[in-house]
Amino acid sequence: MLLNDREIKELIDKKEIIIEPFSYEQIQPASIDLRLGNRFRIFRKGEIEVIDPKDFKDELIKIEQDENKIIEKYKYTDVIITENPFIIYPGDFVLASIYEYIKLPRYIAAQLHGKSSIARLGLIIHTSAGWIDPGYEGHLTLEIFNTNNVPIKLYPKMKIAQLQLFRINPVERDYKEKGGKYYKEKGATSSEIWKDFI
């Protein structure tokens, strides 16, 4: 059953659902607004010939920091922004994180959707992974794609997504207990699909 605003508020007040930081203004009639974090992960163009899901580990090879706080990795470049916008160019794909930390109980599942105002700019905020299992905990990763023919500026803490919450019968084993790959993820987290081949 999809939760309404009253039920969402009640579960947050009881600390059954944890969203931090949180303001009651984020509660919509049947969802919660979520904001964009400040961590982005970008594929390093020209350095990857092909992606092999069996061997997609993101091995750290070097770290460089300057005033823009850029950290270099093998397959990605990590960018942490503070006040300036992050610009996503036409046809670009980036991983980003949600600002809020989320924790769901074993009887709540969730679905993540882009906000309509964001979609009308030509921005897809999750290319396919919108489902969140009961027991999830962490900062959700967004898979952002610019379908527009012009660049789009993204600002830290701007409203970017809506989280719908569904009450279900309590699961036998939740996301944590099943060893979910992205349990307690922080920042924009790379694919760990290679673990499916072990």
From Swiss-Prot:
Catalysed reaction per UniProt? dCTP + 2 H2O = dUMP + NH4(+) + diphosphate
Q: Which UniProt keywords apply?
A: Hydrolase, Nucleotide metabolism, Nucleotide-binding
Site note Important for bifunctional activity, residues = G130, W131
Q: What InterPro entries does the annotation carry?
A: dCTP_deaminase, dUTPase-like_sf, dUTPase_trimeric
Residues bound to dCTP: K115, S116, S117, I118, A119, R120, D133, T141, L142, E143, Q162, Y175, K184
Name a biological process GO annotation. Answer: dUTP biosynthetic process
Q: Does the keyword DNA damage apply?
A: no
- Residues of the active site are E143 (proton donor/acceptor)
Q: Tell me which CDD domains the record gives.
A: trimeric_dUTPase (cd07557)
Q: What is its EC number?
A: 3.5.4.30
Molecular-function GO terms, alphabetical: dCTP deaminase (dUMP-forming) activity; dCTP deaminase activity; nucleotide binding
Q: In which pathway does it act?
A: Pyrimidine metabolism; dUMP biosynthesis; dUMP from dCTP: step 1/1
Q: Which NCBIfam families match?
A: dCTP_deam
* Family per similarity comment: Belongs to the dCTP deaminase family.
Role this protein plays: Bifunctional enzyme that catalyzes both the deamination of dCTP to dUTP and the hydrolysis of dUTP to dUMP without releasing the toxic dUTP intermediate.
Oligomeric form and interacting partners: Homotrimer.
Q: What is this protein called?
A: dCTP deaminase, dUMP-forming
What is the protein's species of origin?
Nanoarchaeum equitans (strain Kin4-M)
What's the encoding gene here?
Answer: dcd
